[in-house]
């Protein structure tokens, strides 16, 4: 059996509608596994059969406005904005991050699969063509460390 796993590097990439069939034709019996994650975090959000990502209970999501300066108020549990989070398992650095990802999240944890906890409905990137989007996890870490060293 072959396992095909796709990560977050495909936010600007559109696969053909029949990509799974093409992969199965080449490899045979394939199990598809998709997760959302990034190098700077200690967890992966697995995708359920309904196409949603489920965050680890060790992650405190902070959905921010596009500039990353303020929290966005949820509307009936759903909130869309820049994905920030506090990773409670980070132990060699501060666990707070602000990413360049634009997400829609259900903070009430409503998912047809029955799994509880925060549900990420969609993941994309803020359009860097509208301005140079320099907000990213590595920049968050750099700013924190630089601030700690300067102070």
Segments the model singles out, each with a brief description of its role:
Residues 1-151:
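Active-site glycine/GP-rich loop and adjacent strand/helix microenvironment
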């Amino acid at each position: 059996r072959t396992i095909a796993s796709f990560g977050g590097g495909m936010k600007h990439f559109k696969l053909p509608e029949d990509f799974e069939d093409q992969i199965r034709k080449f490899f045979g019996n394939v199990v598809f596994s998709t997760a959302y994650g990034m190098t700077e975090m200690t967890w992966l959000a697995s995708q359920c059969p309904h196409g949603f990502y489920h965050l680890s209970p060790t992650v405190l999501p902070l959905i921010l406005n596009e500039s990353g300066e303020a929290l966005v108020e949820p509307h009936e549990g759903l909130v869309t904005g820049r994905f920030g989070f506090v990773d409670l398992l980070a132990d060699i650095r501060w666990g707070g991050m602000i990413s360049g990802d634009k997400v829609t999240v259900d903070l009430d944890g409503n998912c047809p699969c029955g799994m509880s906890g925060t549900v990420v409905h969609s993941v994309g990137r803020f359009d860097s063509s509208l301005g140079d989007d320099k907000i990213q996890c590595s920049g968050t870490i750099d700013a924190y460390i630089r601030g700690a060293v300067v102070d």
